[in-house]
Amino acid sequence: MRQNEIDRRTKEDIIAYVKEISGQYTPEWRMNEENPDFGTALVYLYADMFADTIKKFNYSLERNRIAFFNELSASLLPAIPAKGFITFGLPPQMESGTQVPRHTQLLANKVDDDGMNLIFETMDDIFATPAKLTDMYVSNGTQDTIHQIYSTEEEALPITPFFLYDKCGENLQKHEFIIYHPYVFYIKGAGQIKITLVPSETNEISDAIMNAFTDPKNVVFSYLTDIGFVPFTNVKCENNTLILNKKSQSKAFWKQEESNYFQIKCEIKEVHIFENLELQNIMLGTKAHKISPEVIISGDSEQDKSEFFPFGESPSIYDEVYFSSNEVFQKKDARISIQFDLDFLKIPIDMDETEITIDWKVIMKKKDFKLDKEYDITIDQVIWEYYNGLGWSRLFPGPEYEDIFSTANGMKGQRKRMEFICPENIEKALVQADESYCIRAKILKIKNAYKINGFYITPLISEVKLSYDYTGHEQSPKLLEMFHNMQVKQYNDIDLNNSREFPLVETLEGNNFIWYLGFDRAPVDGPIKMLCNLYDTAKHKMPELIWEYYTLQGWKNMNVIDETENFRKTGLVTWIGNHDFIEKNIFRKTRYWIRIQDIENTYGMYHTRFIPRIDDICLNTTKIIHLQNKEGELLFVEQPTEFLTLSLMNTKVCWIQVWVNETNNLSLSEIDKLTENKRLDIVYSDNGVIESIWVKWEEVSDFSLSNGKSRHYLIDRNEGVLHFSDGIHGAIPPKGQQETIKVNYTFGGGEEGNLEINQIQMLNASVGFISTVTNPTKTYGGCDVENIYDSFKRNAETLTHRNRCVTRTDYEEISKAACRNIVKVKCFSGKNQDGEEEKGAITLVVLPNDYQSCNNSFEDIQEKLFAYLPKCMDSNIVGLGKLYVTKPHFLEIRIRAEIVVKDFNDVFGIKEDLNDALERFLDPISGNFNEMGWGIGKIPTHNQIMSIMKGIKGIEFIGNTFIDHYVDGRFGLMEVSIDKINTVYMLPKSGKHDLIFSVKKA
């Protein structure tokens, strides 16, 4: 601010005037500045003296103004310290925490005018815990959702900003169970799987529930293949049994090597249908028909499965035939059937001519030519066997199917069928180079086995088909895994066969939103502090949240000091962790858990207008301030005198306490009164004898209301000087043989304390095991000592409003005086903080100085105004809760225009000039035509913007021009129509402009 000038002439103006009139008064003399003579020197001397006189004359108004305000005891407002947050780090693998006391000093990377690092101090005690925040989840029982917000194992990773209780990313909640069995489910081709649900004794399964299982909108059944789970397309139900049909062209079941189980998965989509269903077992069965054997081996060679001799063309005792099928013969306890077409071929025995005993003669009789009798060699008895892991055992305990290859039933084609229950101890057998599940038939008895003349009645088999069916022999799962709420519960066949009841589905605890915080160690002891850094401050009161932690007795309420006001604003959450914290597995993570419940389910019902966005969470974080604490500075009074002044060692005093030693000047009644008012500090010796009595004196703004006994003083905070009175309007401190005045105070502050993130990284002195420090947010709110011109304006306004809020201007000026971090403020009457009509309401729309770089400063301003303004305004407005303090919303303006220029070489320069001009014009602080910025609620019009654009030199023509408007939405900037939104609390700002250039045609 420049002082008012009565006479604006300068030294140069005076010299020019003398030079001009000298020709009229002394025509014989000419002023020569290049070769000055005595006259020229005299002119310069005169001009210096005259300019100095004008300067003093012009300053007389300011001097008189200063004298006037001095008479009113006006003063410059002191420096304001910057505030912020600091995060302490401990070494990795640290087992114990560290206590960091209040007033711990930290050094910034920035230096002050004296070349010293700026010093900050912690404002509260904090216990730096070795616990780390490793996981965050949000769940909702009503919506049946689980979302992961954050997860880290080793190194702490930055937290991605998220909205409180927002369903972001994939819903991790799944309701499904997987049935494991090593052989029942193995189906390669077409087949049928039966799953029978066995309800608990107190439960019945209705037809509606069973039918719900068959609807893929409710439940999806799938089975594991080599490409993953493949759904069944055909699901039916009969009574309590679900029938899953597998088509022949479908992929075969696949067994994972590590688990050695075939799997069927049931994914439940509509949970509410099955919420009350409890089971005690699940029985399994499969059925398949007309399965061809995988391999048939006879006589050490693999046979053609379409038609073959099971024992060769010339069977003999102990010949064997092997039927192999991994699918069929590992179905332990299932009913297995084998069907085949059996025919017999008559194959002559190959005879050796040397064995013919004919007595040849020259002349022979007819009887001499008679040959031996021919015999039919047939199979009378076979034995069916299976491999049990140690050797081959009988498949049938009796003579069943021993005569299956006998010709007793005729030699014409027959369809044979044999059935048996697959043994439970059947194992794979190694036959030639193939290891598989198989059975074999071995010849035990052959009729006419040793005859050498005749025919082999050899069996011929074709169309071999295998079948299996578990009907009546259902199996329990070897393992049943239930997946609910990201938890896994396992039941083995023993559990299931012992009728252990279990619910089919388990829903989340509670019907509201719950936010879970998982720590790798128990965050115990304290005070532990955690910073919740929010993107913005909510205008309204937020829904109540309940903090809990997990113990042996379950969830317990947690006593926290929540400075965020239920995440309405950025702040610290403080607690002292109890030692009954225990680990719990939630969401497949074994952690020490804290949870935050939306107890009224307000977020779930979408009743909140504002959803907090949390940008960061920092554990082991506390408040800091750009001040230094000085305790017990002693001052000596040599001789009590009127208007005594004493200087402190430091300037820019913020907070101060003055104690005076009045050991010999107090009566008993005064001691009692001062003790009651907590203004007395008595120091005792080791023997219990009073050594000194210190009395706390009070700071006042002036001595006009003080009397001779008033223990009052004044403080010049900017200079660090104490002022005492004359003994009539305020007491005089007594003298003593030692120092009689003790001062505790803090000093510092200033705009230099406003630092960027990570600019504070050192401790002034080591503290415990603290290894790192850093400021996770910008420090804010620091102001220098008020300059004299701002003081003139403020004090002049004070004379107008007298610290009483009556008019809108009064509210605005008093707000600026209460908080010097305000760059713009506008008062609205009859409107609430949302810009809506409300009778009797007063709303102050405040723009902080650092609005572009720091959101936290507004919260500080808001607190100061709510603390200061009620003393200056109608108590009814405050009592009815109709005083609102909010900040303006920014309307980002983006311009799309077609610009025509003369030459391509002009494009770069004009584009830069145009962007700069728009940036300057739309600046909310220094924009507009008058460079005084835009008033709150004033938005530039289309014509005003066009006027600025047309003023750029070099533009030939401006074609199609469109102005787009954007505001901050929940998920970023969103475009709005300027005609359909309430702009009463808005300020413009420049966005990114889309300027398309072209060259004017010749």
Regions found by a protein language model. Give the residues of each.
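Short flexible coil/turn linkers enriched for glycine and charged/polar residues
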Residues: A79-I80, T378, V524, K652, ...
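Buried hydrophobic packing residues in well-ordered domains
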Residues: H103, V235, W384, W547, ...
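An aromatic-glycine-centered, glycine-rich loop/turn in mixed alpha/beta architecture
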Residues: E912-A1002
